């Protein structure tokens, strides 16, 4: 009997253990089903709050299934996209001089023109406080379906629009649908997305009578109307969903200034003109004041970026007197200093931007600043240099040729401006 009791006792214990294990398994399966079922119900949007100065890894946000919608009301950690450094990028550019040769201006097609080094292509911009995703051409086009862009300004604006078109052409080739008489203003269309990109030539953003040839040689001083905006861009402005507006370098040219249809002074004019030299900073301040006020008061629903002027890297001279740029890789901040003229231009731009934001308040909320000056200051290696012309040293390796240390090779550093712009559009980061 004793043995029989022990057997029954053991059996009861085993039965108890089996029931316990089974109950545990059922509970785990039910929990997993709950998490899986409801975790898949909708994307999770992560909001990061707290101390904005703390080091937090970038927020991963799952977007809606509708890829054409730009996410709104998504909080991500603050990050100054314009303060950082260039780091090695083994992947290199997303397009090549060959894949986008038809869009690129011949003067910026450095590799085709014979530039012997290619190391300048293998760098990318890394902000100090966050990661910056690689430009996603497909994502950009999906977001821009049925929308219109314009990049407005001088030849650097043209340089930038060509960069953007080349990056987007990895998904779909743009079709040129318009050009002006001198082929300076153009428009392209991406048919599959009904997306248009315009490049508007307006180097001063205000009305100007310019007397120079295709090589930039002037036969007379520019007649600049500081208080009259150039309708080449203002007429198009109300229809735009996005615009990048810039100016700067052209204000350094010799010019006569007009306000209220009367000459009021000049810059760089001869003493015999009997006019007061007001300085280019006066003209730039006055013009930008009218530009910024127009944008802020326009009540546009589009997103308008104002890009600061970008410094050149001429050494031992300038464009017209033998300046060169021979560096082949980025430099540290401590190794380069912005030129005085570039500082003056940038100061005017920052001051006018801050003024209009302060004065207009919410009326200026769609106006954003793109301050790429510091970012590109450390890339003296990214210019065509002597390779603005096709194979300039083939006939004479010691030939004296004009260098371009202002514009940017394509592909090249200017492509990474688009990384920053897409991050601002998608995640709402405004930089500073």
UniProtKB/Swiss-Prot annotation:
Keyword field: Membrane, Signal-anchor, Transmembrane, Transmembrane helix
Cellular compartment(s): Membrane
Miscellaneous: Contains 2 motifs that are conserved in esterases, but it is unlikely that this protein belongs to the catalytically active pectin esterases.
Highest taxon, organism lineage: Eukaryota
Family annotation (InterPro entries): TBL, TBL_C, TBL_N
Motif (GDS motif): 153-155
Similarity remark: Belongs to the PC-esterase family. TBL subfamily.
UniProt short sequence motif DCXHWCLPGXXDXWN motif, positions renumbered to this chain: 404-418
UniProt membrane topology term: Single-pass type II membrane protein
Gene: TBL23
Keyword Membrane: yes
One Pfam family of this chain: PMR5N
Protein name: Protein trichome birefringence-like 23
Keyword Magnesium recorded: no
Transmembrane segments: 13-35
Function recorded in the entry: May act as a bridging protein that binds pectin and other cell wall polysaccharides. Probably involved in maintaining esterification of pectins. May be involved in the specific O-acetylation of cell wall polymers.
GO molecular function: O-acetyltransferase activity
GO cellular component, one term: Golgi medial cisterna
